[in-house]
């Protein structure tokens, strides 16, 4: 694991934003009291620590103490890297330095716990002539890239230093805080929480909407509890159902009618019935305690969001009334510009779009990587050989508590993974401890399951019964599952970007499911007959009620009409739609794939058509199935914790050990989130020759390559690192090469004439949909399985890339606002074509590999788990030294793995529990 030292400081300090995250540097000046003798420039001006010049660097693992120049109040401590050319975060003066040579004080290097570790911070002793005061608790600095020199500036103000020139002052720009930008954001101690709340404030539409949303949620909880108690203890159902005479009589012609007031018990009698039930009183006390906890948390969050509103208004110059018209990209751009101008002093410097995404999506990127490696979601084998994925809201909350935010989790809600998880000799001890934590959490879930189940039933009853009465067909509609939002998500993709992409993919994906559904003529025949008979009975009762409304007073007539309507609606959903018959399911799948970008493999599915259908069906599931999963979640969550996650404790510990890196200025993040093609690329996704990843280190389904492409298109100002930039250049070159091979525009027109050539398409998304669903037949012999060949896609991709680079080509004659609105749509269309292009190249490469394998060994089955077809299919190892036999669950998955998930019902697999304890836990 690559160990990168971040900006140091105390890691357990707390402030407004919680735990002290890495690289939190308070702005100077600030409202908090500063240590004595601060650094000052000429005229008593306070200067930023970033305006000071760096000291010379050394390659030895020692610390260098630089005596300051006359009047220089700063002490510099330096650490040298061992393997990379050092870079410095501070600006270098253009003229030679006049500082005295440093005095080297050698220290012994600390022991290394792995080949990728770096020594801890070197110690230094200040000169006797310049005593070093204690650092301010908020001042935290460090390197920007791994294994490089860094400098820490200490306050040391000798007498008369305020009027002395600072070294490099004549050559370096002074970064200072403008007088009008002084607020609570100048002393940020948890940048993860700060950036996350900035994003959440924008997505939740400002402080007023956040306040009302929290108030309504608290009020909804009170309503559900009080109304349910009222229905249980304060209503006389014998009077309401007219089974006994009412409590009092009323004069007049309507004296025999039962009113609601007749069935409601008096308040004293209602309170007495509540007191007579100790269980109900206990549940009400629990509900009151939970409500008070939610109220306290909401109040604390509202104070934080009020500060965020002030930050938006004063620092970003976005008033609340204009927030809805400002996209997130503009907010992020202003945030980065504010940091570059010195108004927000955080590290790394300069702040990039990727740094912001790393902090907002620190835990989410881990979850996406866990899903990519097969550890999420939980799966259960089905009797017919396939498997069912399960990831309810309750299970996702428990996973979050186990791994990230719980008191006994790996991260414990912070930005740093403890050092013990980065040591390979403690993996067995940590796995056993995590198993005990899972067992404890499963026991708590099992104990609370009756209460949670009752709450789920009540909430579903109050939320969906009206919809069932008014529109029963809504439960037959499909919606993206929680599994889809996890498996189809790119690394570093924000929630609103994912929602927009899946929203564009919904219609073609739903059409594909209707077109590719396996034929079931008998089921359709029975459904038609059921619709006819239930509809006939419903029509007869409806006519009778129209003729005489007293028919509704007959017992169970209204209930019968409701049941008949629901039955007809449900049965009609099993009848195939005529408009979907005859449409090519392959074209619809390609149109959906253009926006989904992924179609993860379904374990145990056989046949290409059946596999694609069941994959999509689990991603885009019925609303009724989703509701049923949430209702059963309190009962199934403890079982999956015990029999899915607990046996995989060692694999999960190994995952965090091998796929965690410490990025300077950011903290510990998932290594997949760096989108490093060299480390996590896949040779079958155009990374051949550019990646050094072993089989267990590769991201499946081209996740690294597609995530890198999406992020680079969405953030054109972002500069990718060397290997990633090389991959993007190679991809652009391959696109140009295939586009040239397809033919020049003068001799071969695009599949949709006039859309790309004259730039008259008002909506790029409409163009893309027309292209994918109605492609022009290719003019050369191509595989019938590729309706839009790679060369044709490359030609279109090259054309639309020119449109993105030339905004004047978008909607000629339109206003500037219209052009800016259409540019993101063009970028989305370009990314869709990139996804199709990469999938086509991947398919071609797989076909070539299959052809070579069948030619060399025609008698050997390619996908046999016991006989791998290529060296790459050998069983991978998660450990670089070969000490761990655990392999990637995604690679292990097969028929044998599926059969051993829950042998004999729900029995625990103890294979991973036999790992010996190799070292004590410190």
UniProtKB/Swiss-Prot annotation:
Tissues where this protein is expressed: Expressed in heart, brain, and placenta and testis.
Keywords, ordered alphabetically: Autophagy, Lipid transport, Membrane, Transmembrane, Transmembrane helix, Transport
Cytoplasmic-facing ranges: 1-206, 297-437, 459-523, 572-624, 646-922
Biased composition (Low complexity): 115-124, 854-870, 877-889
One GO BP: programmed necrotic cell death
Compartment annotation: Preautophagosomal structure membrane
Keyword Transport (UniProt): yes
Catalytic activity entry: a 1,2-diacyl-sn-glycero-3-phosphocholine(in) = a 1,2-diacyl-sn-glycero-3-phosphocholine(out); a 1,2-diacyl-sn-glycero-3-phospho-L-serine(in) = a 1,2-diacyl-sn-glycero-3-phospho-L-serine(out); a 1,2-diacyl-sn-glycero-3-phosphoethanolamine(in) = a 1,2-diacyl-sn-glycero-3-phosphoethanolamine(out)
Motif annotated as Tyrosine-based sorting signal, chain positions: 150-153
GO cellular component, one term: phagophore assembly site membrane
Topology with respect to the bilayer: Multi-pass membrane protein
Stretches assigned to the Lumenal side: 228-275, 545-550
UniProt main location, coarse: membrane
Compositionally biased region (Polar residues): 85-114, 890-899
Transmembrane segments: 207-227, 276-296, 524-544, 551-571
Intramembrane spans: 438-458, 625-645
GO MF assignments: phospholipid scramblase activity
Family: Belongs to the ATG9 family.
PANTHER family linked to this entry: APG9 AUTOPHAGY 9, AUTOPHAGY-RELATED PROTEIN 9B
Domain notes: Forms a homotrimer with a solvated central pore, which is connected laterally to the cytosol through the cavity within each protomer. Acts as a lipid scramblase that uses its central pore to function: the central pore opens laterally to accommodate lipid headgroups, thereby enabling lipid flipping and redistribution of lipids added to the outer leaflet of ATG9B-containing vesicles, thereby enabling growth into autophagosomes. The tyrosine-based sorting signal motif, also named YXX-psi motif, promotes interaction with the AP-4 complex.
Function recorded in the entry: Phospholipid scramblase involved in autophagy by mediating autophagosomal membrane expansion. Cycles between the preautophagosomal structure/phagophore assembly site (PAS) and the cytoplasmic vesicle pool and supplies membrane for the growing autophagosome. Lipid scramblase activity plays a key role in preautophagosomal structure/phagophore assembly by distributing the phospholipids that arrive through ATG2 (ATG2A or ATG2B) from the cytoplasmic to the luminal leaflet of the bilayer, thereby driving autophagosomal membrane expansion.
Stated name of the protein: Autophagy-related protein 9B
């Amino acid at each position: 694991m690559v160990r990168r030292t971040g900006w140091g400081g105390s890691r357990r300090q707390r402030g407004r934003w919680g735990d002290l995250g890495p690289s939190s540097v308070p702005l100077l000046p600030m409202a908090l009291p500063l240590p004595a003798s601060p650094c000052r420039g000429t005229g008593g001006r306070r200067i930023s620590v970033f305006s000071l010049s760096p000291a010379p660097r050394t390659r030895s693992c020692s610390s260098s103490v630089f005596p300051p120049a006359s009047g220089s109040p700063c002490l510099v401590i330096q650490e040298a890297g061992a393997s990379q050319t050092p870079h410095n975060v501070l600006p270098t003066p253009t003229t030679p330095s006049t500082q005295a040579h440093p005095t080297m004080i050698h220290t012994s290097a600390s022991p290394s716990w792995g080949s990728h570790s770096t020594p801890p911070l070197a110690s230094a002793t200040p000169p006797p002539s310049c005593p070093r005061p204690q650092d301010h608790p908020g001042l935290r600095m460090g390197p920007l890239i791994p294994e490089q020199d860094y400098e820490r500036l200490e306050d040391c103000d000798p007498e008369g230093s305020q009027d002395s020139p600072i070294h490099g002052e004549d050559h370096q720009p002074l970064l200072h805080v403008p007088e009008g930008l002084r607020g609570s954001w100048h002393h940020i101690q948890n940048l993860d929480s700060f950036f996350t709340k900035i994003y959440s404030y924008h997505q939740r539409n400002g402080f007023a909407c956040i306040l009302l949303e929290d108030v309504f949620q608290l009020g909804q909880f009170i309503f559900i509890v009080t109304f349910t108690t009222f229905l249980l203890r304060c209503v006389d159902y014998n009077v309401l159902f007219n089974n006994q005479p009412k409590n009092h009589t009323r004069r007049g012609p309507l004296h025999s009618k039962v009113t609601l007031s007749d069935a409601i018990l008096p308040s004293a009698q209602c309170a007495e019935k509540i007191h007579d039930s100790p269980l109900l009183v206990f549940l009400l006390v629990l509900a009151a305690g939970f409500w008070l906890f939610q109220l306290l948390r909401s109040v604390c969050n509202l104070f934080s969001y009020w500060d965020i509103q002030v930050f938006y208004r004063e620092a970003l110059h976005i008033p609340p009334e204009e927030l809805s018209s400002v996209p997130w990209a503009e907010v992020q751009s202003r945030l980065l510009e504010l940091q570059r101008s010195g108004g927000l002093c955080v590290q790394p410097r300069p702040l990039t779009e990727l740094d912001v995404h790393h902090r907002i999506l620190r835990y989410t990127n881990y979850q996406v990587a866990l899903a990519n490696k097969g550890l999420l979601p939980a799966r259960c084998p089905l009797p017919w050989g396939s498997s069912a994925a399960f990831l309810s809201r309750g299970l996702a909350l428990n996973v979050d508590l186990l791994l990230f935010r719980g008191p006994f989790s790996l991260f414990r809600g912070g930005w740093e993974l403890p050092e013990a998880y980065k040591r390979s000799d403690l993996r067995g001890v940590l796995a056993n401890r995590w198993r005990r934590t899972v067992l404890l959490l499963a026991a708590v879930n099992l104990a609370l399951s009756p209460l949670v189940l009752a709450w789920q039933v009540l909430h579903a009853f109050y939320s969906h019964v009206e919809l069932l009465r008014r529109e029963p067909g809504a439960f037959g509609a499909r919606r993206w599952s929680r599994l889809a939002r996890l498996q189809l998500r790119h690394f570093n993709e924000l929630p609103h970007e994912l929602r927009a992409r899946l929203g564009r993919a919904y219609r073609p994906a739903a059409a594909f499911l209707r077109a590719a559904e396996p034929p079931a003529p008998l089921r359709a025949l029975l459904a038609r007959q059921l619709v006819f008979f239930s509809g006939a009975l419903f029509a007869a009762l409806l006519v009778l009620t129209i003729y005489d409304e007293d028919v509704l007073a007959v017992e169970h007539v209204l209930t019968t009409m409701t049941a008949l309507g629901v039955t007809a609606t449900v049965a009609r959903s099993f009848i195939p739609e005529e408009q979907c018959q005859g449409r090519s399911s392959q074209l619809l799948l390609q149109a959906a794939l253009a926006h989904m970008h992924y179609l993860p493999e379904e374990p145990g599915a056989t046949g290409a058509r059946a596999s694609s259908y069941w994959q999509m069906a689990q991603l885009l599931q019925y609303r009724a199935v989703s509701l049923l999963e949430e209702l059963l979640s309190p009962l199934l969550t403890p079982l999956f914790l015990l029999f899915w996650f607990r046996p995989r404790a060692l694999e999960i510990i190994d995952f965090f050990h091998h796929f965690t890196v410490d990025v300077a200025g950011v903290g510990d993040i998932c290594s997949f989130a760096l989108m490093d093609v060299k480390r996590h690329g896949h040779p079958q996704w155009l990374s051949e020759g550019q990646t050094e990843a072993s089989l267990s280190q590769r991201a499946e389904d081209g996740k690294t390559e597609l995530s890198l492409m999406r992020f680079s298109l969405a953030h054109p100002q972002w500069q990718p690192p060397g290997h990633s930039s090389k991959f993007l250049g190679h991809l652009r070159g391959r696109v140009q090469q295939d586009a040239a091979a397809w033919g020049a525009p003068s001799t071969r027109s695009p599949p949709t004439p006039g859309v790309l050539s004259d730039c008259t398409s008002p909506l790029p998304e409409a163009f893309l949909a027309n292209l994918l669903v109605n492609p022009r037949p290719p003019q050369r012999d191509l595989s019938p399985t590729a309706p839009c060949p790679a060369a044709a896609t490359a030609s279109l991709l090259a054309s639309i890339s020119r449109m993105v680079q030339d905004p004047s080509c978008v909607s000629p004659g339109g206003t500037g606002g219209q052009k800016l609105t259409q540019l993101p749509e063009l970028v989305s269309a370009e990314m869709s074509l990139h996804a199709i292009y990469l999938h086509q190249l991947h398919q071609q490469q797989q076909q070539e590999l299959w052809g070579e394998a069948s030619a060399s060994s025609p008698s050997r089955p390619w996908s046999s788990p016991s006989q791998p077809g290529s060296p790459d299919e050998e069983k991978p190892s998660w450990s670089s030294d070969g000490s761990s036999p655990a392999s990637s669950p995604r690679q292990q998955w097969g028929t044998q793995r599926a059969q051993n998930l829950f042998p004999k019902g729900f029995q625990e697999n103890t294979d991973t529990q036999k790992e010996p304890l190799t070292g004590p836990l410190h």
